[in-house]
Swiss-Prot record:
HAMAP family to which the protein is assigned, alphabetical: Ribosomal_uL10
Stretches that traverse the bilayer: none
Organism: Legionella pneumophila (strain Corby)
Subunit comment: Part of the ribosomal stalk of the 50S ribosomal subunit. The N-terminus interacts with L11 and the large rRNA to form the base of the stalk. The C-terminus forms an elongated spine to which L12 dimers bind in a sequential fashion forming a multimeric L10(L12)X complex.
GO CC list: large ribosomal subunit
Record protein name field: Large ribosomal subunit protein uL10
Keyword flag Ribonucleoprotein: yes
Claim: Ribonucleoprotein is one of the keywords in the record: yes
NCBIfam families documented for this protein: PRK00099.1-1
UniProt gene name: rplJ
Signal peptide positions (record): none
Function: Forms part of the ribosomal stalk, playing a central role in the interaction of the ribosome with GTP-bound translation factors.
């Protein structure tokens, strides 16, 4: 389907706007995927907060110009789509890694975070990063542990005294423990 000049400019503006807000980007080859598989992938991407778009490579290059994902331009060859993570750096990587296991024809080419390109072999490291909520909960657990230990240490002498008094009371009552 050919696009007129106004439609092409609109696509470039849309992708540029999303790319300027994105945290990471993944480029993948979708050759061999069926329409149903692509529809399922797009649906999951929407749920995950990932912007997934199939755009002509020349338009994608123009859209990524002057963004931190300009480094992906050399990889925009053949039928590829771009997935942009808007909430967490690992969202798009995790989504496409899971789908690459299910649909073997999906080939992840590269990932870009912070202006650096990582190849498909390194995507596992980014995909395994915790989400923001998971990271906050782990941090809170680590911060809470020393305080809990301190509170237990402060409470132990009182608890020991209470147990000793209970044992003395039971012994005087004739019920040896």
């Amino acid at each position: 389907m050919t696009l007129n000049l106004a439609a092409k400019k609109a696509v470039v503006e849309e992708v540029t706007a999303v790319a300027s807000k994105a945290i990471s980007a993944v480029v993948a080859d979708y050759r061999g995927l069926t329409v149903n598989q692509m529809t399922q992938l797009r649906s999951e991407a929407r749920k995950s907060g990932v912007y997934l778009r199939v755009v002509r490579n020349t338009l994608t290059r123009r859209a990524l110009k002057n963004t931190e994902f300009e480094c992906l331009n050399d990889l925009l060859v053949g039928p590829v789509f771009i997935a942009l993570s808007l909430e967490a750096p690992s969202d798009a990587a995790r989504l496409l890694k899971d789908y690459a296991k299910t649909f073997e024809k999906l080939e992840i080419r590269a990932l870009s975070v912070g202006g650096k390109v990582y190849n498909a072999n390194q995507i596992d490291a980014v995909a395994s990063l915790p989400t923001r909520d998971e990271a906050i909960s782990k941090l809170m657990y680590v911060m809470k542990a020393p305080i809990e230990k301190f509170v237990r240490t402060l409470a132990e002498p009182h608890a020991k005294l209470a147990r000793t008094l209970a044992a003395v009371k039971d012994k005087k009552a004739g019920n040896p423990a």
